[in-house]
Amino acid sequence: MTDRYAVFGHPVAHSKSPQIHATFGRQEGIAVDYRAIDLAPDAFLAGLEAFAADGGVGANVTSPHKEAAFSVCTTLTARARRAGSVNTLLRKGDRWHGDTTDGIGLVRDLTDRHGLDLRGRRMLLIGAGGSARSVAPAFLDAGITELVVVNRTPERADELIDAMGEPGRAISRYWEDLRELGDFELIVNATSAGRDRDVEFKLPLSLVNSMTTAVDLNYGEAAIAFLAWARAANCRNTVDGLGMLVEQAAESFLQWHGVRPQTDEVYQTLRQGAAVLAGED
């Protein structure tokens, strides 16, 4: 039976992951059968098991399934356990092993590709779902001074902060308190609100200072609304999630195939097709 790989999401037709992994496979001389599988939340667990029965040995997981993927894993990496979220699955026998590569992928993109020094920065994280949980630990590990999490459901933000285990550096605040939070060198949107074409981000301009970098974990059309706000607010840099996507994919590829591919070629190819969302202003 041929080994199969996939990305699970809902929706997922827009995903660039099949293209990315096909390119990585060509670079490394590895035949890769990788496809996108759209499953509604109530169909995810059954769909994942059907995938395994049909030769599935590795998978990426995107919104809204990252926390559900965490729950099915028998073994987890330390960073996945801390995040409570999984975006990379590896089949070991008849069980799943889970990891989260989003955080390390995003930090690598920001530091290596965009030249940002994250040490000493004050960071605002908007959202507290699986995507937010997957990146928060990596930013703390990268040396940010303070992580402030806001979410429309405050209990979710509290849960995320509790999972970080660093009460002196990571705190949650109410959405209604945004105007009172001061300014930040890093603002990260980890919500999926931008998938609604009619959405408009109306965040306080007081969040922005002369050094602010705004990051959206989404890419393509889903990142337009937040990055439009960031540019209008005169953020120094705006970065979408394309680089994170490529870098986390490389980390997944390494776990599945034992080699970490070069990422610049596939990033530049994808970026040329998304010029409207240029990584930096």
Swiss-Prot record:
Q: Return one Gene Ontology term, BP aspect.
A: chorismate biosynthetic process
Q: Which UniProt keywords apply?
A: Amino-acid biosynthesis, Aromatic amino acid biosynthesis, NADP, Oxidoreductase
- Name the active site residues: 66 (proton acceptor)
Q: Name one GO molecular function term.
A: shikimate 3-dehydrogenase (NADP+) activity
Chain sites annotated for binding shikimate: 15-17, 62, 87, 102, 219
* Protein task: Involved in the biosynthesis of the chorismate, which leads to the biosynthesis of aromatic amino acids. Catalyzes the reversible NADPH linked reduction of 3-dehydroshikimate (DHSA) to yield shikimate (SA).
Q: Belongs to which family?
A: Belongs to the shikimate dehydrogenase family.
What is the protein's given name? Shikimate dehydrogenase (NADP(+))
In its UniProt entry, the species of origin is given as: Stenotrophomonas maltophilia (strain R551-3)
